[in-house]
Each structure stands twice: as C-alpha cells, then as structure tokens.
A protein has these predicted regions:
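Short clusters of small/polar residues that mark proteolytic maturation junctions
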Residues: 30-32, 87, 157-159
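Short beta-strand segments
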Residues: 9, 68-74, 112, 134-141, ...
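Short beta-strand scaffold segments in enzyme catalytic cores
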Residues: 15-19, 120, 142-148
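Beta-strand initiation motifs
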Residues: 25-29, 152, 158
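Short alpha-helical segments enriched in small residues
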Residues: 115-118
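ATP-binding/phosphotransfer module of carbohydrate and carboxylate kinases, centering on a glycine-rich
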Residues: 1-67, 77-82, 99-107, 124-131, ...
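Structural signature of FAD isoalloxazine-binding scaffolds in flavoprotein oxidoreductases
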Residues: 160-164
Length: 337
C-alpha cells in the first residue's frame, strides 16, 4: 500500500494533526487533542499516539502504513534536539525528540519550529507559487519563516533563522527611549509588533489626557483584558484601537522592507490572528505604507516585465491548520521517495 504521512503541530495547549497520502492529498479533517506539554515529553508522546491512531482510523489504514512524521514545536531546535524551553516542560530541553519518537513508533521523524512549519504550510497550499515565500506572523510574539523555491524551509545552523521579531527598528517611545524586548535587547521589531507590545502601547496611551474618557480606562479590567478587546474595537472603528494597529502595521512593513532587501522573496505572507480580522485590508495598507517608506524602488515598482511590482503581499490562507499541513508536506518530501 502507498505510504501516508502525518503532520503534528504541538502547541502549548493542543496538538493539531493531519494525514496526507502519497500524492500529498489531505485525508479527512484535522484531528485535535490536548498537548500536555507541561507534563513532559512522554505525556505528550501519549497524546501523539492518540492523534496518529485517530488519523489512521479515519484514513482506513494502519499505523504501519505511515511512512514519515513531520513535527513542529514552539521552541528552537537543531538536529532533532530542542535547546530552548519556550512553552514546553523542562525535560524537553536537550532531548533528541526525533530519535525518541522514532524509537517509540518505528517511523522516521523530522522536526522544526512552529513558524517554519506554518511557512511550509502556506507554501504547500499555493500550488501556483514556485518562487520563495516569506511568512511574518504577529501573535504573542513575532515569528517568521522563509521557504526556498521547491518548498525547503531555511532553518539556519542552530534552527534560529528568521527570528524576524528581533531585527532592529528605529522607533522610539514617547520618552525618547527604544522599547525593551522580552529577549533582553532594546529596539526589536517584536517590541512594537506583538500582543505583548500592544498591551504596553495601550497602557501608555491610556495615561494620556486625550484618552482619559475612553471606556478602556475603566479600573474594572486588567490590561490583558483591555488589549484583548482591541481587535473588535478596531473592527468597529474605535479611534484608539485603530491608532495602535496603524502604528503596528506601519512598523511591521518598515521591518519587512529590510527582510526583503536581504532575502528577495517574491511573496510575503502575513499570518497570525489579524489574518482573520475584519479590518485586515486596512491593516495591509498600513503595512504597505511602512514597506514603501523603507523598501528600495525595485521592490515597489520593478522595471522587469510583466509584473512591474516584484514584492507581493498576501494574507495567510491555511488558518490554524497551516503548521500541521506544512509538516505533513515536509514528511512526504523527506521520506516519500
């Protein structure tokens, strides 16, 4: 029987999994189970077993018919070994997860980080795109991934390539200082473009006289709860929310211009929760505004026919399943020949 390939996206709370056949066609829906990552990798492996068994049952095959597993984690890794904790339990760090899972299942395993997986997923579902693809995904932090023509993600020597949130941008706080990033440095793009940054910026704005009567100035909710409301407020035209997202979009585009200058991708894909927002077209305009301010003219209005514009922007299409789809695609590419 032709082999099938499994993609597993391990998050802090859930595992999203998918199975594809030898032709790369998804079989059945995405299967989701709890990840239990804080309980250690052995507990998560038990959940992976559940997901794989359910996928195989839905596809009408046995686990023996699985030819490879692609796995992504919310942590840096290299050669199958996780070396940064991120949202995982302590015993994940320093462990060769690929070797452990291979020994448990008898199936070859490849692992990368979650943003790389999502980038591969976005590449794999764009069947007409044959060039390189840069994914930039604002979320709690700001992640990214770069897929080369042919579908291979660039991971770097240490698995740290495309930490896009930690390129420097020259934007100052109201006090004239560069904002501090969670990585310990100052001036990182993530310190402006992330949920963590949005909370700080909201708190700073609410201290200003012009927002004294804004309903978010109520003492009845935390800054986290207030920031959670901003997307809905922006969708309904709230001036404060729009101001905050407009600045985020502009700075994101400004930083993307530097990434484009280094990587020269034909397509930039924007991921994260804003891909599902009702004001995403407006946000993309703000991103392009920052990009056009910083980008070389060749990336804005190329003299090369026929496009005339060499850098295209699109929103992510894979949704929550992009990473698992990307890892199934990777497993098929690595182990299917």
């Amino acid at each position: 029987m032709p082999k099938h390939f499994v993609g597993l996206d391990i998050g802090g709370s859930t595992i999203k999994s998918v199975i594809v056949n030898s032709a790369g066609e998804q079989i059945g829906p995405i299967v989701e189970v709890k990840s239990l990552v804080k309980n250690g990798y052995e507990a998560t492996f038990g959940q992976l077993d559940l997901a794989i068994n359910e996928l195989c049952a839905g596809a009408g095959i046995s686990v023996a018919d699985v030819g490879g597993i692609g796995l992504d984690v919310p942590a840096p890794s290299s050669g199958g070994v996780i070396w940064g904790k991120a949202n995982l339990g302590d015993d994940w760090v320093g462990t060769d997860i690929c070797a452990k899972l291979n020994a448990r299942t008898g199936i070859p395993v490849h692992m990368t980080n979650d943003c790389n997986a999502a980038a591969i997923g976005e590449y794999s579902i764009r069947h007409k795109h044959i060039g390189s693809l840069l994914l930039v995904a604002p979320g709690t932090g700001l992640g990214g991934g770069f897929v080369l023509p042919g579908g291979k993600v660039y991971e770097g020597t240490n698995g740290l390539a495309l930490e896009v949130g930690h390129i420097s941008v020259p934007f100052l706080e109201d006090n004239g200082e560069l904002p501090a990033c969670t990585c310990g440095l100052k001036g990182c793009m993530e310190a402006w473009v992330s949920l963590v940054a949005l909370r700080r910026c909201l708190q700073n704005e609410l201290r200003k006289p012009e927002w004294a009567t804004h309903h978010l100035n109520s003492p009845d909710s935390t800054i986290e709860e207030k920031a959670f409301q901003l997307r809905t407020l922006a969708e309904n035209g709230d001036a404060l929310a729009i101001q905050l997202f407009k600045r985020q979009g502009y700075i994101l585009g400004y930083g993307i211009a530097d990434l484009v200058r280094v990587l020269d991708p034909g397509l930039v894909v924007l991921g994260g929760g804003l891909a599902e927002s009702k004001f995403r077209d407006q946000f993309l305009d703000w991103v392009k505004g920052g990009f056009n301010e910083r980008a070389w003219s060749v990336y804005r209005h190329s003299p090369i026919e026929p496009e005339k514009i060499t850098t295209h922007f699109e929103w992510a299409e894979g949704g929550d399943g992009a990473a698992s789809i990307g890892m199934a695609y990777t497993a098929r590419e690595l182990f299917g020949h």
